[in-house]
From Swiss-Prot:
Chlorophyll a binds at residues 686, 694. Its main location: plastid. It is a multi-pass membrane protein. It is found in: Plastid, Chloroplast thylakoid membrane. PANTHER family: OUTER MEMBRANE PROTEIN, OMPA-RELATED (PTHR30128), PHOTOSYSTEM I P700 CHLOROPHYLL A APOPROTEIN A1-RELATED (PTHR30128:SF19). The lineage of its organism: Eukaryota, Viridiplantae, Streptophyta, Embryophyta, Tracheophyta. It catalyses: reduced [plastocyanin] + hnu + oxidized [2Fe-2S]-[ferredoxin] = oxidized [plastocyanin] + reduced [2Fe-2S]-[ferredoxin]. This is Photosystem I P700 chlorophyll a apoprotein A1. It comes from Pinus thunbergii.
Amino acid sequence: MTIRSPEPEVKKVKVVVDRDTVKTSFEKWAKPGHFSRTLAKGPDTTTWIWNLHADAHDFDSHTNNLEDISRKIFSAHFGQLAIIFIWLSGMYYHGARFSNYEAWLADPTHIKPSAQIVWPIVGQEILNGDVGGGFRGIQITSGFFQIWRASGITSELQLYCTAIGALIFAALMLFAGWFHYHKAAPKLAWFQEVESMLNHHLAGLLGLGSLSWAGHQIHVSLPINQLLDAGVDPKEIPLPHEFIFNRDLLAQLYPSFAKGVTPFLTLNWSEYSDFLTFRGGLNPVTGGLWLTDTAHHHLAIAVLFLIAGHMYKTNWRIGHNLKDLLEAHKGPFTGEGHKGLYEILTTSWHAQLAVNLAMLGSLTIVVAHHMYSMPPYPYLATDYGTQLSLFTHHMWIGGFIIVGAAAHAAIFMVRDYDPTTQYNNLLDRVLRHRDAIVSHLNWVCIFLGFHSFGLYIHNDTMSALGRPQDMFSDTAIQLQPIFAQWIQNTHASAPGSTAPGATASTSLTWGGGDLVTVGSKVALLPIPLGTADFLVHHIHAFTIHVTVLILLKGVLFARSSRLIPDKANLGFRFPCDGPGRGGTCQVSAWDHVFLGLFWMYNAISVVIFHFSWKMQSDVWGNISDQGVVTHITGGNFAQSSITINGWLRDFLWAQASQVIQSYGSSLSAYGLLFLGAHFVWAFSLMFLFSGRGYWQELIESIVWAHNKLKVAPAIQPRALSIVQGRAVGVAHYLLGGIVTTWAFFLARIIAIG
């Protein structure tokens, strides 16, 4: 008798929905706090409005039904997309209605981008600066003009049409959000169908998304940009649909188009190398990446993701099963390995979100570093204001997203983690040796902090004593970043050895002596690294490690600690462990996110200061007819940034002159923002450095005075809770700091760049 193991059941993936789940009604809109029994009663004290805002989107607190929570999140995503489409539509509409896009397109080296004109009310029209070509408006640094040119947009009419299209898509998204919550709401099983979701997201979003963009680039962007680069008047260039429907037009520019798909079907793919290139480096006309390289890149990415989108098992017997994959991962030292993680990621959206935010935040920072080193759009590299803005923007956003990852990881630990189902797997093992992790990380932070700061203090002291020969610098005691220089050199010498088809390295910043200039401005050149970079790099290492220490400690000790063993019962955010237990304040997971934000701010500030000064000193500048490059700050980074005094004197103070002296000019708004944002930042300290009782006492006196005059309010005033005060404090601290930096950077770079 043969015993057969039962055939593994092939699950059937179906789209399952519930019809007419929630009645559509506007009545709830008139009942603030309808989602909570306590809030729905209405306000007794002013705390009500704070709790209303804190809990409005905390779907976990509205219900513990995972299916309903999933549907709310899904529906909210469509609302988010609608907002994005409305915002994009506004950007394109401004380009169509209020901008000098067509003038910029005709002469991008002499005309600056502007898409906002201030109305003449009480003299505000002073903000309309002369951006060239007789146009007066606010100079913008968002990079939209450059991306429009790369897309092949040649007229303001096309921008109008796109703006209208975006509004139509916004309406569609709003409809979809309503439809999939009220009319046809997916069942929980659909949200947990990970293999199908992976296939569709990989093949659909990333695969077909990249393929359609590659198609647009090949059929529309490439020919239009080729003609623009050759100096053809934008009004003479055929419209996009003419290129799409008339192959002969394309064949004039790219001869392989005349052959159609024959080379593709006969595997002679190299025939297409006239529009799918592998050149490396930058286009000397525009200072951007070769658009034929980027089209090739998107086509390759599309192929990879289309394959990736067919790797996971759904209704057929072929492909990976994610649960099996995770549970098969057992190393010799990792116990049960990934066992149990599948259940976590399919039942806790906080855990899922934490992983995704950590990835997305890191990717955003990677984008920041590639935008300047491999500028993807025409004339982006020589628009210094835009380069600085894009780098700063992506660094800030990446920092915030990474802190968000820690926040949601901690919420997962508090609300969704079930210790009974997680035994000896990786998560359990990390939690069991959390003391070793945190204490070692703490040691690393102390080491990095003392040593990195100590190098600067040494230099300041030697400088003050008049002993330059004893300083750490490129001209005295050298601390060269030899590993970074080795990586630069490896990449600079790659073309011809490891990448035989490439004519230049991936980025000019690696080295090799080439420099690209556009209209007598430097687009990019090899970036030298020396002692100054070595020093500031270790400050980066220090601030990043401290941020990680705070955030990771918050996650690892979110449920319990030696100080508060029952922390999980107190929730994600709480001020202290009740009265009578001193020294237990500021230990909640929320407080760790709060503290982590300040160190994230420290970390990103040092990065953007480093970038701003380094680029002005060693990269950005003008080139004379004789080929001599003059940098904006004349290469002073290497000698000035090696002391704290140098950073204060030659960077912050020297470069603040433009924003401080901006009054009476078209940059005066930045001067006012600089002043106002300092005030907002200082205002935050009032919330961060004072206790709740102080304000409650003050409020009691004020209420007494109102009672005397018989004008006492029906809703009782209350001081902010400890957590609310800290939230308001950190929000103003970050807003004030970021706007101060924004005004400082832009006034400087627009005035001189």
